Structure formats: C-alpha cells, structure tokens
Amino acid sequence: MAAISRLPEQGTLEQDQSKKINKEAEALINSSSYWDTDDLAAPHSIKDGKEASKWLEGYDEEARKVLQQVAVAAWNYFTAASPITKQHLTEAEDVARVFLKASAKQAQQFEASALEDPIEQKELNVISKEGLNALDAKTLARYNSLLGNINKIYTAVDVCESKEQKVCIQKYSDLISTIQINTDGPHALSIWKSWRSAVGQNLTEIYEKLVDVTNKAAKLNGHEDAGEMWRSAFDMIDAGKKEKMYDVAKATEAAYAKILPFYTQLHAYFRRQIAATYKSDESLVRDGPIPAHLLRSSTGDDWSAAYEETKPFDQMDKLPEEITDNLHKQTMKSRSMFVKVFRYMRYLGFEQLPDSFWKNSVFSRIWSKDMICNPATAYDMINGTDFRVKICAQIGQSDFVEAHKLFAQLYYKFLSSEQPFVLRDAPNPTISGAVAKAFGILATNVNYLKSQRLISPDAKLDQASLINELYHEALSSVVKMPFSLIADKWRYAVFEGKIGAANWSDEWWGLREKYQGVGAPKNTPEAQYDAVVAAEISQQHAPASRHIVEYVAQFQVLKALCAHSKTSLSEGCIPKKETIMRLIEVMKKGGTISWLDALEQITGTRELDAGPLVEYFGPLINWLSSTNEQDAVFLGWDGEGEKFKPEDIPRPRSENVADRPSIPSDDQIAYPGGNCAHGQECLLDTTCNGTICVCNAGLFTLQIGDTYNCVPDDPANAGFRDGSGLVIAITPNNQTKNGNSTDGDAASNEDSTTEPPKTSDSTRPALFSLLLLFAFVLSSVLMF
C-alpha cells in the first residue's frame, strides 16, 4: 500500500496532538455569546417565554455551524481514514463538547414551562441536559481514560490458547475467530479460561472505577444512579420531578416472557444438536444449562457459528444465488443497485432526494483510500441540501437488503429536516433502527423480487429454506435478547450498590442460568470474571435494552406495514401506499413526538409487544415444537443433570458444498478481515483461517476501525498506533431539503402503478443521530 510510506511525511497523531489542525472548527470557539458561561442567571430563574424562544432561535443557527464541522470531519475520516483525518474529527468533536456544555448551562437559566409551544419546551429540555459534561474537566478526562484503557485491553493484551503455549501472540480478535470454528471441547474451554485469566482482574478494577464515575455524572444530572440515567431515554423520567411515563425495564422483561416458550424450544433443540459435536464433553447434559464455552462466541450471545452443524435441513437456499446472478445479468454496479432500490422507495411514496445524494454518496469501496466500511451509514451533512450514504457494497442479496435499510434510515433524517434542529431524526434511535430493519425484511419478499426480475416468475421460498433462514436469524439475534436483559439487570444492580464486587460473579451467573439457560464451566475460577470481560458490559458502556426494544419493535413495524397482506409475516410483503404514507407522516415529525407516540402512530399500540416477533418466527417455532416432541427432548434447563445417552445424540452434520460454482460471485468472495466461514474465496493477499480472511505470512495487518489491509511494512512505523481514546462516530440530523434527484426521475412516473416498478434485464452505519450526539456528549443516556 503506497500510502503507508508517505504517512511519516504527513506527521502522526502522537506528534501533532498539541498542534491544532482543524482551523475551521477552532475558529468557532467563542465566536458568539452562546459559548459564554460567565454571569449566568440561576437555573429556571428566567421566566420570560419570548426571551427563551429568541434564545432557541439563535441556538439553532450556532449549533448548525458547530455540528456541520463534526459532520464534515466524520465523513472525511470514515471515507479516507488517516492520522490527519482522525485528528480533524477529534478536534471537531472537542469543539462540539465545549459548545454543548456552554449552551446547556445557558439553557438551564430558562423555565421551560414559560414557553407556550410544547415543541420549544421539548427543545429546551434536550439542550439543557449536561450528561457526562456535568463532570468537572479532571473527572471527565478520567472517565475517558478508563474507557480508553478498556479498549487497550481488548486490542493489546496477548493471550495463550493453552497453558502449554510458550509464546502467546493471540489478540482478542484472533481468539474470536478461533472460537467460532472450534469443535474441540477441551480446547474451547482452554481458550475461554485463558482470555478471562489474562484480562479479568484488570477489567474488574477498571470497571469498578468506571461505575463510580458514571454514578457521579448521573447524580449531577438529578438521577439516583447511572442505571436511572440510562433508562431515562425510554422511561422519559424528568429528573427532579421523578415522573416516570414508561418502565422500559418492565417492558423488556415482559418481552422476554413472551418469547420464553420459543427460546426454550430453541435452546433445547440447539443443546441436543451440539451434543453431536461435543460428545466427549461431560459438562453438556440433556436437561441442564449449556456450558458457556461451548457456544462458539466470546460471550455466548450469538450461537450462529454452530449453524451449519445444527441447521434443521441440509438443503441450500438457492434464492440468494439467483438474486446475485440476476443482478449481474442486469449489469448492476453498486450505484445502480441503489438506483433500483430508490425507484422502489419512490413507488411506495417517498419523496425525491437532493442531487447531492447521488453526487456525494459512496456506494462501493474506494481502493485508493483507507475506508472504514462498517457500519454502512446514512448521513446528514447539516447544510440543508446534502444527504449521503456510505457503504462498501458488493452486488448480491446481502447488500441489496442493506440498501433498503439505508434508504429507510436516510428518509427519517430527510423527512424530519424541517423540525427544530435538535428534534430532527427519530425521537429515539431504536425507532429508526426498527423501521430500517423492517424494510430489510420487505426487501426479501418473493413477489417484490419477482417484480424486479431478480428471481424467476415461478420461484418459491420453500418451507425448508424458510425454516433454515429463521433458525439462523434466531441463533444470531433472538438469543441476544436474554443476554441483553441480563447485562442490564446486572449493571443496574451494580450501579445501585445492591451487589459489591465480591458478589458480582454469583449474581451474574445466577442471572445467566435463570434467563439464558447458560452455565459456567465447572471448576473454573476464571468464571468469576465473565461479566466484566463481556464486551457488552465493559466496552459498550451503554444500556443493552436498546437492542431489545429495537429488535422487538421491528416486527411490530413490519406487521403494521403488512397489515393487509395475505402472505405470512415471515415472508414480508409489498406494503400498500396508504400504509407507507402514514409512516412518512410519522417520520416528518421527527423528535417532536416521543418514541412511544411514534411507535403508537406506526403500529397502533404504545406497548412494546413481542407478539409480532413470535408470529414472524411461527414456522420455525412449529417445527421446533414438533421435532423436540418427536425426539423426546427435555425442555428447559432445570433438570437433574442427566447425561446424554448414545441414542439421544443426533448424527453429526457436514457442510454441503456440492453445488458451489467454480467462478465465485461477489457473495462468494471476501476481503481482508471478511467472513469466509461459508467457503468464500479470500482475496488481496489473504488466506481463510476457517472463519475470516487473514493476511498471508510475512505481511502486517493494518486495522482502521473495521477495515483491514495487508501491508508489507509495520504500520506502527508509519504513524498508525493504538490510541487510548474512543473515536465517536457522529452523524448529525437533517435540514431543509432542496433539489431533485436526477437518478430518481424515472421513478417519479411510477406512482400510479399497482405494482413496484419493474426493470428490464438491461437496467444497471450505531453512527449516531443528532440526539445521539447530544446523548454521547451530554450523558450516558446519550449512548443510546
């Protein structure tokens, strides 16, 4: 990579940290009265509504200037990562923090109830929250340092796979890939113990300090503890008044109870299937919890690595390959694939996008730059006309589905752009995320795919393929629900001081066994560190409930969009235009309504309801129930520890590779760091280690974010060093929309049709919303 050798001439972050290079951002500091914190009035002492309204008007203009610098710097960094673009982003974020802290102090002077407009009241309340910025500079720096140290442990600590290993060079990322392909029980246990032994004690000490600092920030914001502060985004607690309009902890517990019968069937089937893989592991019994080290993931919140040897049916689904083939036959490129999806969105009733969308978006990887490809993300550049997406798309079903999700995210930003600046985008990121995921399911509907000539007119999704697809989804996502519930229950108890560090392990494993049916490996002292080594606990210092809310809500949104469809919910639908128009009206309101209002206006209920989720997985649930009954499988994990009998254990499976094409499609190739677990061919000087593409011997791995490159020289010598801080990926919200999309013109005449626009064979991200920016900068709730 030629750019490596030139980087030293440009300087490194270590050399330039004291020298400010983002002049545009620096010039904004103290450029108006909104940065001033001297001689402020007492909180809520200004009761003149007109004065408060005028202040909000000026704030709107100043905030745009500041956050536009963040948006531009973020775009430049994620599309062309380098020490220079990273420093530009860091400095823009630092300037934004100064502004947000100062403006929050100013906003606190005003009495919100003096404003006649309820939207202005909400606007003022959002701005006045300090969150973590309520900490003094020294304590805030300590908080950031603690997070940085946690990240260093995850990236820098060397771990042995076994006690016999003399030279330990494996990192956390190496262990993850090894765990996913490991089918040897003792070896899996050795890796499981080694990681916890290597980092557990250090992480425990750091996490205790992190809890203390986060609780201090919560109290400064009027909350009892950090758990209450985290929940406030969903509970909508007004600190001080203590009026709880919703109990998200109770709601997520109810959602778990609703899916528990399904989860129990899934757990029982999976436990029996992996017994064929781990026959010699006596810790796996037919009626008890599954030992955590046998789940093929670092924390046991994703079981999909065992999909191939446990899937219900051996046959392969041919539709993804057919979709990919037909996209190629239509001479599709990444950009034209997005044009195809955009025409569908236009058919459904969504508006034209500005010309800038097609001019400025990045649809495929730019190989001359070090792009950070993941996550694929929708951006609002804050200038009123510029909305973009960034994705390293490949032609195939996966990114065809991703395109639908990105458009849904982008339209939430675009359509709400006429709302006050801090109330643009969804009222809570879980709502926009749920809508986006629902559109991802719509993209797989057979009738829609036929209309796009992506599958043959007589193609059908057979029952076996559907059940396999639902099973894979359940292993990767449904099993996360109890783990996320546990993660928050445990942390809330820690924040509240109900359990001390000496009892952390007992509480953690009690919750894991009760809710997840997962147990600690026997006679392993290292298990005491299991909670703090979980990335969702220490690395992702934010409430896990947001995952449950978003995941459950996506099926509620899907059911609302498919209310008039005759197909099963599992198959998606082509929504009616009047249904989409109701969704569009909700999107236009942005954050001026609460997340519960948005949920109600989209789905018809203000409750988080897992019923549609259960309906969606209905075919799989019925199959699991029948199969488990036929095989006399024990349901639950509260048995006496009965061992599997030989006749209880199914035959081992092997992957069916008979029908792989000799020339791989885009879905069957992978790049450095990419997934090759299903036979993808590794490109660009890499070899498959069984799970991911790793650099060939003699090459160095350069990792920037989630993007990997294989280079001949040590990247550390070229200015790429492991930093101690977190890069905040910020995507601000929308503004006024102007201009028409030239690429979408062909879709504008399709609105009167009764089917999605047909095409001939010749037709060619948790980044954060603006509220997340305020959240991240202002509080841990911000971390939503």
Please report, for each region that a protein language model flagged, where it lies by residue.
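Active-site-proximal, well-structured secondary-structure segments within enzyme catalytic domains
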Residues: 166-178, 209-390, 461-473, 479, ...
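Conserved N-terminal segment of EGF-like repeats
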Residues: 661-739, 743-744, 779
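Post-HExxH zinc-binding segment in Zn-dependent metallohydrolases
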Residues: 248-259, 426-462
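Cleavable C-terminal sorting propeptides in eukaryotic secreted/cell-surface proteins
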Residues: 760-784
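Active-site recognition of the HExxH zinc-binding catalytic motif
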Residues: 398-414, 433-437
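C-terminal, non-catalytic "cap/extension" segments appended to globular domains
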Residues: 22-24, 34-52, 84-86, 235-240, ...
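Short pre-active-site segment immediately N-terminal to the catalytic Zn-binding motif
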Residues: 387-403
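N-terminal helix-rich structural modules
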Residues: 4-7, 11-208, 535-545, 592, ...
